[in-house]
Amino acid sequence: MSAALPTSSREWHLVARPHGWPKAEDFALREAAVAAPAEGRILVRNKYFSVDPYMRGRMNDVKSYTPPFKLDHPMDGGAVGEVIASNAEGFAVGDHVLHGLGWREIADVPAKHAVKVDPGLAPLSAYLGVLGMTGLTAYAGLFDVASFKEGDAVFVSGAAGAVGSQVGQLAKLRGASRVIGSAGSDEKVKLLVEEYGFDAAFNYKNGPVRDQLREAAPDGIDVYFDNVGGDHLEAAIGALNVHGRATICGMIAQYNATEPTPGPRNMALIIGKRLRLQGMLVGDHADLQPKFVEEVAGWLASGELKYRETTVEGIENGYDAFVGLLRGENTGKMIVSLA
């Protein structure tokens, strides 16, 4: 047990449920007391925590696949840090762990919910992204849910984000015939082609997605990885070839909508083309974790898989990081650094 534990920790609370776009007054950065960990628990000084699109849904008081954040309680999410006190077998002071109690400086974590990580294998922040839940989402969504096979043509929306950029690269590494991505700026489009190896990419703000996708994929697509929804999903349904598959991972285009969003107008095409559209939650694919880490760590070590992070410094900027993510201000994984 460490002798000089901190006595307090700052943590972000949700204090009001956002209507539409989250506002600064919906959140509060508060101070909480820190105590020595009880039996079976560890105290972790967080070095990095993750902000993710799914968290917007947890701010609504609706029944969903994961419970909503409680008002006036600390929010949570992926975090990685260093053990500063342990009252659990198998964990020692100085160990680095991945856990689910982000949005705070010091986390009191049940040891059974912490996983040791190796800072020698990859930077600690990578365990929140390319080697973490984000990476497993890309890996499982492409290979398991979409049943990707060599020779498939793949379209990825939100392709410059943490999940999308990895999906496109994984498809290329496994032999895709063509990989197309959409992004929200010309700079991101250039990044997709020049750094991540996409065969084609377009800025969805420069014209109808349907037209730009048709130009980028004249022979159609076999797999669509959806991070956006809306007009991207409609365009993909139009471009998918017979027996095409779509992984529906996210719909960031409508997370802050205050009215019901219109559905794709071409759903009837699903019948004639015999398409398969399947939603995914990464938690259903935990069995792939060992294979995923082994394969992706190898591609990282060889330099074949590239990734970027957008890092916001300081816990006091957690709200800004989250809203920036929803606005698409990040390239790759959005992370808050407390290091």
Regions of interest found by a model, annotated:
Residues 70, 75-82, 92-158:
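NAD(P)H dinucleotide-binding glycine-rich loop of Rossmann-like/cofactor-binding domains
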Residues 128-207:
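Mid-domain Rossmann-like dinucleotide-binding core that forms the NAD(H)/NADP(H) cofactor-binding site
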Residues 208-219:
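Short amphipathic alpha-helix with an adjacent loop that forms part of the alpha/beta core around
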Residues 33-51, 59-103:
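Glycine-rich beta-strand-centered segment in the early N-terminal region that forms part
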Residues 2-4, 17-47:
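A short N-terminal beta-strand-loop micro-motif at the entrance of redox/enzyme domains
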Residues 2-12, 304-311, 319-339:
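C-terminal capping/lid region of NAD(P)-dependent oxidoreductase domains
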Residues 192-193, 231-305, 311, 339:
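Glycine-rich phosphate-binding loop and adjacent beta-alpha segment
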Residues 86-90, 181-189, 205, 209, ...:
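Short glycine/proline-centered loop/turn elements that form peptide/ligand docking sites
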